[in-house]
């Protein structure tokens, strides 16, 4: 997603001299001081930025275009490292010789006390020391728009339409500690959150992980307006499809909008693989469909899927896809369930229930590509681009390998309370960048149906502080005191606390939806077949 670049970085300078005059002033100053160094244009621009004259990027500015004292840290990296991380699970075993971490069950979690953060940098110089961790954003929250139409106009100006020139990549930026504007909702105010993600209720002692806001370089994300989004979703269906990270994001989206509906006008129904949150007043639904590999697999049971030997049918998608047809907004993901082994087991005829199950093995990246090709063919054939919008979420990183952010003696993400914001080296948290690249290439190659690739990976790698760690469930029960005392085995560094990081992912989705032109009228949900 690109939005118009914010002019002048931290805000316009009233009566500021022209660029030529500014450059001349720098040369004049150098001559007066007797400096006989020939500056090239890049050095001059850097000097101007350091002295606050003009400038395009905001270095350390808060949201909305400025704010001295805002803590801002950057990460724009899209490097490629292929260490393997634990797959969706509870027990982490010692890595096999291939360097792949193997994992078994399906859930564990954790907590976080302090430490000095580590900054990931984005190609800019990392010599400067970030501001004190206690600095906070001093700006006041932006005023609420007086109407949905005003908010829509503002969002259109930022995200949609013709950018008229230079635009801004919203996935390149920094995390800003913004106690005034974050979080977007309170954990205690959203009754639809599951115990898996309610970290504060489950015993986490700090809440700083809720107060970081993503600030793109040189532009701003539109402020989340639940009422505006629900107007866009009136008579429509929005569905997350994939694994438990997409379920994590679905819960976030439900909490972001649910306060706009009275209690008696909203409901949540769980029916096997499909969870449906309905807002009667808007005749809209926000849904989650469990399909961890998108295609058929032996892990498709939404409740009993703690399977070590995962087997897939890479060309069989129709059974799941029958539930996606006609949905107005589709948000797909698949990643963490691929990370158990370096090879995937492919069903060789027959069915998963027939014993013994016969299968072939395929290298993981090749199998992932085969599955995404099956998925993309279904999308191209069955999705009407005039009616529906498709998103694909990039890799949600795990934080199992603390040496990757400079703490070899730490235990995974346990006791992390701050993002990796001061780390001057490349983060190495075990992300499989080959799978990332495969998903990116497949989605970009699609012709008939455009797919929005939501690039959450690099910005999420910084957030080692935001996982559920030991403050979560294990096999449907909260961790015991004894289990919490054993974070090496029980800390969940896969899933995320809510409120938290997935709210930012949904802000990207929100930006696309509210800035897109209104789709043609569709048949109200009440007249569509009920799922």
Swiss-Prot record:
One of its GO terms (molecular function) is xylan O-acetyltransferase activity. Its main location: Golgi. Glycans are attached at residues 271, 283, 422, 455. Its EC number is 2.3.1.-. It is a single-pass type II membrane protein. Residues 123-139 have a biased composition (Polar residues). Pfam families: PC-Esterase, PMR5N. Residues 50-164 are annotated as: Disordered. GO terms for biological process: xylan acetylation. The chain crosses the membrane at residues 23-45. InterPro entries: TBL, TBL_C, TBL_N. Disulfide bonds join 168-219, 190-255, 199-497, 413-493. Residues 53-69 have a biased composition (Gly residues). It is an enzyme of class 2 (transferase). Xylan acetyltransferase required for 2-O- and 3-O-monoacetylation of xylosyl residues in xylan. Catalyzes the 2-O-acetylation of xylan, followed by nonenzymatic acetyl migration to the O-3 position, resulting in products that are monoacetylated at both O-2 and O-3 positions. Belongs to the PC-esterase family. TBL subfamily. This is Xylan O-acetyltransferase 5. It comes from Oryza sativa subsp. japonica.
